[in-house]
Structure formats: structure tokens, C-alpha cells
Amino acid sequence: MQIILLEKVTNLGNLGDVVRVKDGFARNFLIPQRKARRATEAAIADFAVRRAELEKLAAEKLAAAEAVGTKLKDLVLEIGQKAGVDGRLFGSVTNHDIADALKAKGFTIEKSSVRMPTGPLKMVGDHPVAVAVHTDVVADITIRVVGEQA
């Protein structure tokens, strides 16, 4: 299916690009989230009229994301979890736990935006984690896992 991107999508394209994607990806993800539209002649003509408005909206989203990114930069977030004597956690700290802790601090971050390169955290200590606030803005934060006695 050919679609017009209404905003920048990671690994796919930028605003206004006409790209070919699998039907399910378009129908189940891109179109319902208003990230894309079917590339019909009417849609392409409508997009040409609305392009300036959409670019302005994208610039505003980017500016807001950069503001959140600067607040998040070098943030140290403490998360308590039950741990054994050797420092291993009973369970783990996942991206869901980190997103909940960030929401408690006043940030609106989705759990899918938390990128953990080494997977869930299973040890007590400081761990670097990347938070993708926007496709162009990634903030590095430190998660300090504090062990609580079981």
C-alpha cells in the first residue's frame, strides 16, 4: 500500500514522503495513529494544500520534545526493588517501571519510548537508559536501582 507520511516515522521517512509499506502496518498502526494517509490523488492534493500547516505542527512538536529532552538530560532516577545479599534483584526493572517512575516525576513518557540496550535491569547499581522523547530527540538518563531487603 502506498501512503503519505504526515509526520516523521523512524526507519520509514519524513513528512510528505510517499512510501510503500505492508498493508497491515498501514491499516493497524500508521493510519489509526494519524501518522500517515493513503496515497490517493485526492489525498496528495489535500496534503499539498496542508503541507505548511503540518510542517509548523511538526516544528512545534520538535520544540516541545527538545524542552522535555533538556529536562531529562542527566536525570538520575531512583527505583527501589527487592534484592538479595549479592545485589541481584528478585525480578527486574523493565521499561514499564521506568515509564511509571518518570510519570511520577511529571514527565509524560510512553513505555515504548524507553530504550534499554541490555534488556531489563537485574542488578543493583547505576544503569544508563535512553529515552526517545521524539524521533529526533533522545535523552540519556541514569537509573539507580536501590536494593531493598526481602
Curated annotation (Swiss-Prot):
This is Large ribosomal subunit protein bL9. InterPro entries: Ribosomal_bL9, Ribosomal_bL9/RNase_H1_N, Ribosomal_bL9_bac/chp, Ribosomal_bL9_C, Ribosomal_bL9_C_sf, Ribosomal_bL9_N, Ribosomal_bL9_N_sf. Binds to the 23S rRNA. PROSITE patterns: RIBOSOMAL_L9. PANTHER family: 50S RIBOSOMAL PROTEIN L9. GO terms for cellular component: ribonucleoprotein complex; ribosome. Keywords: Ribonucleoprotein, Ribosomal protein, RNA-binding, rRNA-binding. Transmembrane segments: none annotated. It comes from Polynucleobacter asymbioticus (strain DSM 18221 / CIP 109841 / QLW-P1DMWA-1). GO terms for biological process: translation. GO terms for molecular function: rRNA binding; structural constituent of ribosome. Belongs to the bacterial ribosomal protein bL9 family. The keyword Ribosomal protein applies. Pfam families: Ribosomal_L9_C, Ribosomal_L9_N.
